[in-house]
Amino acid sequence: MCKRSAEAVVLFLISFLTKSCKAGDGTAVNAVTNICTEIHYLKQMEEELKLKQVQLGTAVETLADEHRQLNLAAARYRGSKKGAAYALLTAVTGVKAAKAATQRAEAVEAIESAQSEFAKKRRQLEALRHIYKASAPQVDGATKGTPTSALFSTENLKCSVDVTFAVATATECDEQTGPSLAIKPAAQQLQTQENYKGVPDNLFKPPKVTNDLISKGNSDSSMNTVSMAKACSESSGISGSNGIGINTATMKPLVETVGAEQLSNNGRCTEPTKTTQKEHHINRARTAGVLCQVRRHLTQPVDSVAIATVGSLVNDPDAQTAALLLDGQVTTEEDADKRQAAVTKLLGEASTNINTKFFGPLTIEDVALKIGSATTKTSIKKAAAGDLYAAALAHFTAEAEKRTEKATK
């Protein structure tokens, strides 16, 4: 019996529970309880989107390569049952390649938009953490002012004091606490997710500072000397009769809270928060709406034909129609058994492995192409992937034409 790591077991259970549950927020969303876990969630989604882009691109490239290989094979064996089988697979692969290209094209804008939004949101959260990690305020630069009636009807003392916050760097979230295992399946759970969880927009504001103000006396005339960094006073400093200043300034710590934002309402993705048609820069609703939009494109990429079996193609309408045409039957045939039989007649039994039977032989270097005075020996697989594709296709087409002419004489 194979052993599983603790992490693998936990991920398996999370995946199992996720598939067993109905629509709702999964473990990933529920694991977001503060700024750091929200950052972890956004990072996970960014990584998943990068992976999805690679998968969609790989599907297009793989199917395009398979289509070229099968097209060469169909040309080589044209006029035979083997040629008809390769022609059928060429048709099926062509349809799949077109679907894969469309799938990627439709997903590009949504994925790039989501990546931009998640990166922006993550930077905003990181900036908020750094702002609140500033070191203790420094009070200095006291400067005597002229009393007016700005605050009270009659003012006796006035002093301007600077409160400076030194720049500081917050501990990285990954150092503070690694990403939770519960967040890892974020992309898989997105399809049934109802909410995005994160800190509210109104949490993004400068720290609150409490100033400890102290005054002594009521005469401004004798406050002619600044002898203290924190206060304006008489020349005798702390023992003087008149003075005013700030003793301490204390920055209030950030109280981290998170809330839920619906991804959609009545089938429509959540709209960004706006004021007079202008989107707020800090916008949790926008992030929720972007998640709603991008999940429509996080579908399984179109599968390669090489990994299929004949059994996985017999119910494919495109494969059935192509098989009927190649077998000289009417494409309007509605009998399911006859449509399936047309496919198996050309490709073999349902258990037949497409890669082994049809792609395997294409790796054999049995193709001799005479280009100029030189003869190049290659395989269909190599020719399809390189600069010899056109030459190989022309060669096989010419050979097939010769066979046709010979047969008609």
Question: Over which residues does each language-model region extend?
Answer:
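Long non-transmembrane domains of secretory-pathway and surface proteins
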Residues: 1-409
